[in-house]
């Protein structure tokens, strides 16, 4: 469709580097939003570099937590005035707050200047947890942010949740209304082919287990190491790859040494996830909370076996026999049972999910319906 007949949507992202949200932005940029011209406002970094490679218009401006409220607000306001988007779509809490402030400031200014155009404001929630400590650490901070989100949602026209669980938490904690569920998409055939390029043949009775996450307490990697140590007594050729970086790297390596499994455990640091999946049979994710995990989506799309905690959006992705209860006393035993079950099982059954094209079509439909509701379409 010609850009002359499309509306501009400005995506606002406060992070410069790769992560779950950057992956989402790139998937949408690569696929396109039907009927809309995508422009991205973000701090300079790897994300903006990749977007330029995709020929996506980018405003790399001083924006994000490190720049502070005043600078971020001024930067975003300038971009909005320059682009005059029909829609401003924010991602992650910092961008949500700044975007709400900027758009609602324009509403106030429009009272004195009716020629000003005020964009529709939409937000996608990627990271709200049932346990407030996961993202906010202290109770006072979580209570403060709860009130901030309640206020900014009053001035937001529509909200997207990446899972049913996410939507439930938004309604329960923030009193959110007009929440639409649009799952993160994954193009399974393309991803499976990409992983297959890195495929390393396995040996009999030599299961290869992969963890792809930050090395931090909420990820439960210590429990995985403990369970793997017991699995290793049954499968002496088993191997565990712990990919990722974080504060617990030394502690987890010491745990592996104390359990006498150092030779069977590799701490590979930051890796290409597709390459890591190519040399693995099973992905394990024991997080305290997940909303719509790209790691699990990719693992399922690649045809790998999976084990994950029964939290957040995980039950919306995985079957019951792939889930373990993190809150029970025998958590490690449950993980071991799931690992053993996967080692003894045949290849996973067929799995289907929302494609990127379906995801972006749903986003476009929400844009159009929200515009109509406001009398703008």
Protein language model regions, located:
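N-terminal strand-loop element at the rim of the active site
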Residues: 11-71, 181
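A conserved mid-protein helix/loop that constitutes part of the nucleotide-sugar donor-binding site
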Residues: 19-27, 207-233, 247-253
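Helix-loop-beta element that forms the nucleotide-linked donor phosphate-binding surface
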Residues: 52-56, 167-186
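Short His-centered aromatic/hydrophobic patch
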Residues: 90-98, 125
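Membrane-proximal helix-turn-helix segments that form the acceptor-binding/catalytic region
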Residues: 141-159
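Active-site donor-binding acidic/aromatic loop of nucleotide-activated sugar
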Residues: 248-251, 261-271, 276
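Aromatic "clamp/platform" in nucleotide-sugar-dependent glycosyltransferases that forms part
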Residues: 288
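Conserved acidic donor-binding segment of nucleotide-sugar-dependent glycosyltransferases
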Residues: 320-330, 337-342
